[in-house]
């Protein structure tokens, strides 16, 4: 978009806040504010969406309806939709690494559905044409390699009464990782703190697709939250990893040696304090996690 010289007021950034506004449970503390400051650095408005109560409330649901979806509105207020109809049911288990989104419910309930709800339930998007850009790449998984580069989005209603024309475009589906880092370097972007500590992709801190070294690293960064996860595994009788409990899995891994106290502090703070675009006197460097361990969505 920057290369095409498109006016910044015609595009907006959206971010699905996995943990919502109540507490940090599964995601990096710094991620929402990093996204906020990233958007500001490029002069782009950003709107956040989340499920009320976030990951934790959805996981702890017991004979209850799923919570409403929440989304920021242009006037600064919060819109809410859903959570009032359907059949009460129970989760009390972590999402599992699977292609089926009913099993991998963190993707469907906390990302995909929340994004769609923010579009479908705002009348300002009626009688408009919307293009959603998303950054999936084919190198990330065999499943993502099959994604269409261009297709109608699930929020599309171009033939309905609201005439809401919504397409999804995946402009970097066929990019290599080298191409991604090249454009990041060109615009002198300081990436999310997790990359500098050794992560090869920025997802949740405790992403269910994480490998043994990532979970060992996450444990070194947030030991209290790992203990809570371990206790919940025992309570549920269901583990994040299919073959063993989380503490056993962590013991098989090695924390990344690029984790420093300084980066730990930045990554676990709710406020991001560094410039997103590097100042002229600071040299851009490839982060430790670049071209590292590949473990992501199936």
Tell me what each language-model feature is.
Residues 1, 5-6, 34-53, 121-124, ...:
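Peripheral terminal appendages
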Residues 1-186:
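ATP-dependent adenylation/nucleotidyltransferase module used to activate substrates
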Residues 99, 197-200, 288:
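Residue-level signal for mature regions of secreted extracellular proteins and peptides
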Residues 107, 158, 205-208, 270, ...:
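Secreted/luminal cysteine- and crosslink-motif detector
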Residues 126, 198-201, 223:
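A short, structural micro-pattern
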Residues 188-201:
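Immediate flanking context of iron-sulfur cluster ligation sites
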Residues 200-212:
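Local cysteine-cluster metal-coordination motifs and their immediate loop/turn environment
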């Amino acid at each position: 978009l920057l290369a095409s010289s498109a006016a910044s007021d015609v595009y907006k950034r959206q971010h699905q806040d996995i943990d919502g506004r109540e507490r940090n449970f599964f995601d990096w503390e710094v991620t929402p504010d990093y996204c906020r400051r990233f958007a500001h650095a490029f002069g782009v408005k950003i709107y956040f969406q989340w499920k009320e109560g976030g990951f934790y409330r959805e996981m702890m649901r017991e004979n209850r309806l799923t919570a409403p979806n929440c989304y920021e509105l242009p006037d600064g207020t919060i819109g809410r939709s859903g959570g009032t109809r359907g059949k009460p049911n129970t989760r009390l288990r972590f999402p599992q690494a699977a292609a089926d989104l009913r099993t991998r419910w963190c993707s469907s309930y906390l990302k995909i559905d929340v994004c769609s709800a923010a579009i479908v339930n705002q009348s300002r998007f009626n009688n408009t044409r919307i293009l959603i850009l998303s950054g999936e790449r084919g190198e990330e998984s065999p499943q993502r390699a099959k994604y269409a580069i261009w297709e109608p989005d699930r929020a599309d209603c171009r033939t309905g009464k609201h005439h809401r024309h919504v397409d999804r475009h995946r402009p970097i589906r066929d990019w290599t990782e080298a191409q991604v880092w090249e454009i990041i370097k060109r615009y002198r972007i300081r990436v999310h703190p997790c990359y500098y500590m050794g992560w090869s992709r920025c997802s949740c801190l405790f992403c269910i697709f994480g490998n043994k070294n990532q979970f060992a690293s996450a444990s070194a960064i947030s030991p209290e939250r790992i203990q809570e996860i371990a206790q919940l595994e025992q309570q549920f009788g269901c583990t994040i990893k299919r073959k063993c409990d989380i503490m056993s899995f962590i013991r098989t891994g090695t924390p990344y040696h690029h984790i420093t106290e300084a980066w730990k502090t930045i990554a676990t703070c709710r406020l991001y304090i560094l410039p997103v675009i590097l100042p002229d006197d600071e040299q851009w460097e490839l982060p430790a996690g670049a071209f590292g361990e590949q473990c992501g969505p199936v």
